[in-house]
UniProtKB/Swiss-Prot annotation:
UniProt keyword terms in alphabetical order: Apoptosis, Autophagy, Lysosome, Membrane, Transmembrane, Transmembrane helix
Name of protein: DNA damage-regulated autophagy modulator protein 1
Database matches in InterPro entries: DRAM/TMEM150_Autophagy_Mod (IPR050911), Frag1/DRAM/Sfk1 (IPR019402)
Gene Ontology cellular-component terms listed: lysosomal membrane; lysosome
Gene: dram1
Length: 239
């Protein structure tokens, strides 16, 4: 009997969620044990700023970005095929959703490459791209899910996706605003520090959005189970 999370192409969102979650948790555990960040809700990027955890963070987030892009492209192809049998979606809508999602993956690559304290402006720009494009992507995918219901999705799945999307959307605003209000960047936050309440609120929202993405991709597993991925290789005779 095959594992339900490995049937068809379901391994893609499954590995994405497992790998991304492990990347966050591994860098958090290492940074806390070494004493680089306080254990109570640091920023995700703070846990991957100092070596050796910075290497773990950068590598795992880079792989997550590639897995995310592969998952989004496969999702795009699935929707394209589904739309052939029942015309429930304009073609451009699926393309726009994919473009936004891939742009978010590029943002993840920027976050992984440019560390928070080394190049803060570039790192912050990458993080902003990741979170904003990520939220836009899952909101669009939730809308698409409702359009394809009940043929390709259950009503319950649509509701779950939209709920996760709205929570992420609500959280991304205070995450950005309170990050600015918290003041200068630092790793050793203490409750007595000026701006700490803003920092704490922003960090909680950041973790909420990040794991909201993971929860959302979990809902793709059922859709991917009935799909197979094939690589076709052709050798041109005139080469």
């Amino acid at each position: 009997m095959h594992c339900w999370c490995l049937q068809g192409a379901a391994f893609l969102p499954s590995i994405l969620v497992i790998w991304s979650s492990a990347g966050f948790l591994f860098s958090y555990i290492i940074s806390v044990l070494i004493g680089h960040v306080p254990p109570f809700v640091p920023y995700i990027s703070d846990t991957g700023t100092s070596p050796p955890e910075s290497g773990v963070f950068g590598f795992m987030i880079s792989v997550s970005a590639m897995l995310g892009a592969a998952t989004m492209y496969t999702r795009y192809m699935i929707l394209e095929r589904q739309n052939l049998s029942i015309d429930f979606l304009p073609i451009y809508f699926n393309k726009i959703s994919l473009a936004i999602g891939l742009f978010g993956c590029i943002g993840m690559g920027i976050v992984a490459t440019f560390q928070e304290m080394a190049v803060p402006a570039v790192h912050d720009a990458g993080a902003l791209i990741t979170f904003i494009c990520g939220v836009m992507y899952i909101l669009l995918q939730s809308y698409i899910s409702y359009k394809s219901c009940p043929t390709w999705n259950t009503r319950a799945t649509c509701h779950i996706r939209m709920t996760v999307s709205l929570i992420a959307f609500i959280a991304v605003v205070p995450m950005s605003v309170f990050s600015i209000l918290s003041g200068r960047k630092r790793l050793d936050w203490k409750p007595s520090d000026e701006g700490y309440p803003y920092h704490l609120t922003s960090a909680i929202c950041e973790w909420t959005v990040a794991f909201g993405f993971n929860m959302y991709f979990l809902t793709f597993i059922r859709d991917f189970q009935g799909v197979s991925i094939q690589i076709s290789t052709e050798i041109h005779e005139d080469f």
